Amino acid sequence: MSTKIAVLGGGAWGTALAAMAAKGGHESWLYARDAETVVAINKDRRNPRYLGDITLADGIRASTDAAAVVTGADAVLAVIPAQAMRNGLSELGTLIPQASPIVLCAKGIEQNTGRLMSEVVAEILPDHRIAALSGPSFASDVARGLPTAVTVACEDANTADRLAALLSGPAFRCYSTTDLKGVETGGALKNVLAIAAGAAIGRGYGASAQAALVTRGFAELRRIGQAMSARPETIMGLSGLGDLMLTCSSSQSRNYSYGLALGRGEDLTSRPLAEGVATAPIAAELCRKHNISAPIIDAVGALLDGKITIDEAVTALLNRPLKTED
């Protein structure tokens, strides 16, 4: 019996996940608002707006009809930007069958409320099972079928295991966990740290400074994870340390690239807004609320707010009181 995976979102990540599902032998449906994108995927097996140089796997059915896409789906992957998740699923969520688990594929914390994506969706669709997919993965790698490993989290262990089995494929390996908030915390906060790493390289501080920022940033991530009741193994795993390593070291990362441009003094007005920009002030406030020492996250928030320069941020970090390493 064939299985159906529905993907909501025709961007790079949504397209890649639809390609992954098709390569796994599933009935793969993709919802996109843009009619030209839908035609191109169905006719030419390409998404001209995203990943235009990649020929997509056979079997993807793209449509502008969200109801047709989600009907009978064994899983619905919500690939909607974090700050648009509430509006997106408020509009589309009523179409999703209650039996279909919703897998959140955006990494971020909602502005104004400070809620994780699962908390946002639980408000909108309280009767649905909610999961999250996160880990070190670039859309272009997944779309090309390059080896990738991620984590699928759901507070219901059986659902987490079923989703991991469903979404795993020839080159896409999923690990399961019930630590939903831990997975989401790592995925959201690494975006902020990636901006710091990119800014250090863009400013010319070198690889040593980059390594120091990532390592000490991970210490902050661990402290925040502990305050959020995340399991240590989750923060040390693919959705925490793994995603941090990838995002803080490659220009394929939108957040790292944003930091690079920031460090180089480039005009940022025409660049796509990186999710870490929205998350930074929320993360800083979260740390203050829980009395967590997070000087790097605080510095990124102040930098993006125009309160300090990169040089001032680095000087302040280097001149903090000496302490034992934690």
UniProtKB/Swiss-Prot annotation:
Q: Which HAMAP family match?
A: NAD_Glyc3P_dehydrog (MF_00394)
PANTHER family named in the record: GLYCEROL-3-PHOSPHATE DEHYDROGENASE (PTHR11728), GLYCEROL-3-PHOSPHATE DEHYDROGENASE [NAD(+)] 2, CHLOROPLASTIC (PTHR11728:SF1)
* GO BP term, pick one: glycerophospholipid metabolic process
For this record, an example GO cellular component is: cytosol
- Please name the pathway: Membrane lipid metabolism; glycerophospholipid metabolism
Naturally occurring in which organism (per UniProt)? Brucella canis (strain ATCC 23365 / NCTC 10854 / RM-666)
At the highest ranks, the source species' classification is: Bacteria, Pseudomonadati, Pseudomonadota, Alphaproteobacteria, Hyphomicrobiales
User: What name has this protein been given in UniProt?
Assistant: Glycerol-3-phosphate dehydrogenase [NAD(P)+]
List the keywords (alphabetical).
Answer: Cytoplasm, Lipid biosynthesis, Lipid metabolism, NAD, NADP, Nucleotide-binding, Oxidoreductase, Phospholipid biosynthesis, Phospholipid metabolism
